[in-house]
Regions:
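Short, intrinsically disordered terminal segments enriched in charged and Pro/Gly residues
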Residues: 1-17, 21, 61-82
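Short cysteine-rich clusters marking metal-coordination/redox-active sites
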Residues: 15-18, 29-30, 45, 57-60
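Cys/His-rich microdomains that often coordinate metals
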Residues: 19-23, 34-37, 52-53, 64
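Short metal-binding segments enriched for Cys and/or His
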Residues: 40-74
Length: 308
């Protein structure tokens, strides 16, 4: 049955690729320049009368035949019970969190994207080393005179090789620039994120919440300057499924903010962009694959890719 012959009240409008459903906003523009809600006219431009065969989806960025957007309740239910139901649950969880933050039009079109079992993560030991380094750097931004003693500490604890070249530059620069200090001050967010991954912080604060967990973080870590051997050797991860979802959440938030630069639209969230970026970076580092047996050196931190 053709979509226009179906009873309107029985139809659900939904992208065939990512399952995004129209939100009542105007997302479409005709080649004549007219902007309108394409579903109010079944894909036909009210201005120039051009009939569009395909419709672009704001959720996944793909164009599919306009007629395929119209589905019955039964067809939607069949879609929702098809494929890997575990990954479907993850899709719903991630997209619900995005919507809750105000990122309403970003959807996952490939369920495989949500499968953390295909990822290879850093060891808990290396994650602990990176957490301590980030914590120390954030502290030293406000205590520059203590840098020489911290260099000695890093070497004594045998984690100096895990300090990145940019971090070493800061540690040995007599007069670091203000911009460098400002950038490095955000390292505390990466450290807290890794602490959450390592079960040293119970809950990560929301990206739009000014509350922090620094006190809990500090209580569950060794004092800066103390021995790290026992602490690092006993580090262990929380469920990788939780870690991976947090990574994807911040990856999609980065995509959202990047897209704002190009589409000129207003930010509809209250997300702290700097916090989200630091989480995105440190979690991307955590799930970066390195050859088995290879040493995780500091250079790898500076090379962390946050492109989307």
């Amino acid at each position: 049955m053709l979509f226009w012959n179906r009873k309107k009240e029985n139809l659900i409008i939904q992208c065939s690729n990512c399952e995004w459903q129209p939100d009542g906003e105007i997302h479409w523009a005709c080649s004549c320049g007219h902007r309108w809600n394409t579903f109010k006219t079944k894909g036909k431009c009210p201005s120039c009368k051009k009939q569009w065969e395909n419709t672009w989806c704001p959720g996944c960025g793909k164009s599919t035949p306009h007629k395929d957007w119209y589905k019955t309740k039964e067809e939607v239910e069949k879609i929702e019970t098809t494929g890997d139901l575990v990954l479907r649950r993850k899709k719903k969880s991630l997209e619900s969190r995005l919507i809750d933050y105000g990122i309403k039009n970003y959807r996952v079109s490939h369920l495989e994207y949500l499968d953390h079992s295909k990822e290879k993560f850093q060891t808990a030991y290396d994650a602990g080393c990176r957490m301590i380094i980030l914590y120390a750097i954030a502290y030293l931004v406000h205590n520059l005179d203590e840098r020489p003693s911290f260099i000695d500490w890093f070497k004594t604890e045998k984690i100096w090789e895990k300090v990145s070249p940019k971090e070493m530059e800061f540690l040995m620069n007599p007069s670091p620039e203000e911009r460098m200090l400002m950038d490095l001050s955000w390292c505390i967010e990466g450290a807290i994120t890794l602490a959450w991954c390592l079960k040293k912080v119970d809950v990560l604060p929301r990206l739009d919440d000014e509350n922090n967990v620094v006190e809990e973080f500090q209580q569950n870590l060794p004092e800066l300057g103390d021995s790290l051997i026992l602490f690092l050797s006993q580090s262990e991860f929380r469920n990788f499924e939780e870690i991976y979802e947090e990574n994807l959440l911040n990856e999609l938030a980065t995509t959202y903010f990047r897209d704002l630069l190009f589409n000129g639209k207003k930010d509809t969230t209250r997300i702290n962009r700097s916090v989200s970026y630091e989480r995105h970076k440190v979690l991307n580092w955590l799930r970066t694959y390195y050859e088995e047996g290879g040493e995780v050196t500091g250079e790898l931190w500076d090379e962390t890719d946050t492109s989307t």
